[in-house]
């Protein structure tokens, strides 16, 4: 039976119950979350808030049944419809912070259909659901489109479409709009709202940016590593505890984070010149005719909708993609004896000249602990062990990662992974720092700290080039803008 003309069928909404529940990742001393008590009724729409590292992602992964017993230690109980989540995985659909981690197959249609196939949905019904889900999330591409050509934001919509097609009783969204442009944020939010209204499924959303989801949810739960901090209607929670929550790092409407404190800047000099530059992949141009300069002691941002080429431009500037046409040349001030073409630089030459932070942080992790990850660059520069340790310790403290020094990078929250990826690039002290969505996954406190750190780098003479959808970051940090709209 379809509902509201969406083509989606009614489902049996799931109930959630947690009693003194806790989870500790393997090799960690601290619990990700502990003493959690809550009950979510069938069909409720719940926004889960909390500071970065509060255990939000751990909770939704546990509800999705993807935390295996050998991945950590559990205490208490966490149940869906009276059963452990792992006993009924088809009941929950999960969209993670990193859409790349959920792209499984090579074509868009096949990827959306994958979950339905695993649930044994009849073939004709699968493809009907695939078309409905594509329409619901506004992903206007042919079913045969290769998934590897999609932008980060498009992959986020693809992941959401896969969940919508499964029509689960519980929809779990972990920062579902993190990689979307402002228009895409509203489109996906509305797509979620329509699909939930049509199916009646229970909804649990994790999102740092509260305002986007207030029109959709009917309940807000705030958690910390020690359990539930606040629970009630959105109006009750935000009116009664708005200032307290903002002070803890929750993005509460009306409580903007502080702007960075600036000092006098070092003198500026040109480092990279782009003239009539064309960028793309596999020999095919995405953007053409770009001309701009990147200078020291300045922040340049590139903005534009999903699929406009921001990531491709950032990777090209970072010396990781070959320009399709035009010119991208380093000045002698940056090249310092190396080739004037960044794409020709060896990895050791890039380390001190241009550091790049990818959109998906875990794509650049190579070590088994946070401390070891931070030491990779300094070791490649052949610094002595004392100098390596000093740099690592400074970055651990500066980016609030010292308590996680011995943790596996892949077990960190999305916000913690982002800070680690920035720290790994800073560890070699490059003159240009290229960042793809640098503020993704941050609470308001860590956002302010990260923006302050970048401001201090710029004031000291470094250059920052950022691809971003974050209007607040652009407002307080940008000196120059390359608009790809």
Predicted regions and their residues:
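Helix-to-loop junction immediately C-terminal to a conserved catalytic motif
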Residues: 64, 318
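ABC ATPase NBD Q-loop/coupling interface
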Residues: 67, 77-88, 327-349
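Conserved ABC ATPase "signature" region
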Residues: 125-142, 386-404
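Conserved ABC ATPase signature
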Residues: 146-150, 154, 408-412, 416
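Hydrophobic anchor residue at the start of the ABC signature
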Residues: 160, 422
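ABC ATPase C-loop
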Residues: 164, 425-426
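Catalytic Walker B motif of ABC-type/P-loop ATPase nucleotide-binding domains
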Residues: 171-175, 433-437
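Conserved beta-strand-loop-alpha-helix hinge in the C-terminal portion
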Residues: 227-250, 475, 485
């Amino acid at each position: 039976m379809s509902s509201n003309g969406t083509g989606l069928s009614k489902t049996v909404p799931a109930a959630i119950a947690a009693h003194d529940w806790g989870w500790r990742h393997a090799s960690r001393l601290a619990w990700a979350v502990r003493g959690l008590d809550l009950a979510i009724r069938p069909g409720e729409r719940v926004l889960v808030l909390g500071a970065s590292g509060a255990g939000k992602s751990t909770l939704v992964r546990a509800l999705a049944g993807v935390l295996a017993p050998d991945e950590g230690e559990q205490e208490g109980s966490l149940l869906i419809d009276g059963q452990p989540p792992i006993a009924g995985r088809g009941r929950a659909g999960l969209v993670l912070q990193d859409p790349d981690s959920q792209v499984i197959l090579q074509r868009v249609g096949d990827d959306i259909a994958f979950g339905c196939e695993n649930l044994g949905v009849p073939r004709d019904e699968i493809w009907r659901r695939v078309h409905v889900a594509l329409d619901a999330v506004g992903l206007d591409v042919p079913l045969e489109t290769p998934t590897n050509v999609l932008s980060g934001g498009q992959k986020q919509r693809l992941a959401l479409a896969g969940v919508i097609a499964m029509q689960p009783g519980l929809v779990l969204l972990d920062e579902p709009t993190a990689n979307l442009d402002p228009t895409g944020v509203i489109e996906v939010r509305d797509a979620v709202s329509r699909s939930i209204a049509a199916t009646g499924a229970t909804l649990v959303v994790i999102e740092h940016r509260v305002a986007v989801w207030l029109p959709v949810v009917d309940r807000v739960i705030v958690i910390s590593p020690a359990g539930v901090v606040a629970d009630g209607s959105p109006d009750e929670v935000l009116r009664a505890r708005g200032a307290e929550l903002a002070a803890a790092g929750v993005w509460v409407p009306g409580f903007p984070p502080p702007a960075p404190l600036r000092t006098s800047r070092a003198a500026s000099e040109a480092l990279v010149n782009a003239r009539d530059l064309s960028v793309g992949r596999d020999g095919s141009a995405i953007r053409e005719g770009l001309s701009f300069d990147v200078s020291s002691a300045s922040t340049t941002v590139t903005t534009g909708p999903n699929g406009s080429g921001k990531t491709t431009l950032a990777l090209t500037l970072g010396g990781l993609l070959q320009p399709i046409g035009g010119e991208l040349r380093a000045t002698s001030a940056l090249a310092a004896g190396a080739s004037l073409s960044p794409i020709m630089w060896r990895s050791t030459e890039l380390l001190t000249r241009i550091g790049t932070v990818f959109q998906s942080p875990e794509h650049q992790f190579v070590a088994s602990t946070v401390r070891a990850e931070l030491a990779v660059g300094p070791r490649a520069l052949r610094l002595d062990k004392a100098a390596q340790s000093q740099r690592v310790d400074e970055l651990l403290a500066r980016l609030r990662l010292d308590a996680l020094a011995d943790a596996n990078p892949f077990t960190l929250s999305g916000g913690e992974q982002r800070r680690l990826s920035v720290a790994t690039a800073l560890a070699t002290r490059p003159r240009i720092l290229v960042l793809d969505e640098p503020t993704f996954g941050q609470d308001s406190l860590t956002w302010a700290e990260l923006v302050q750190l970048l401001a201090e780098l710029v004031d000291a003479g470094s250059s920052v080039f950022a691809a971003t959808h974050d209007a607040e970051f652009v407002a307080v940090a940008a000196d120059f803008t390359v608009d790809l709209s």
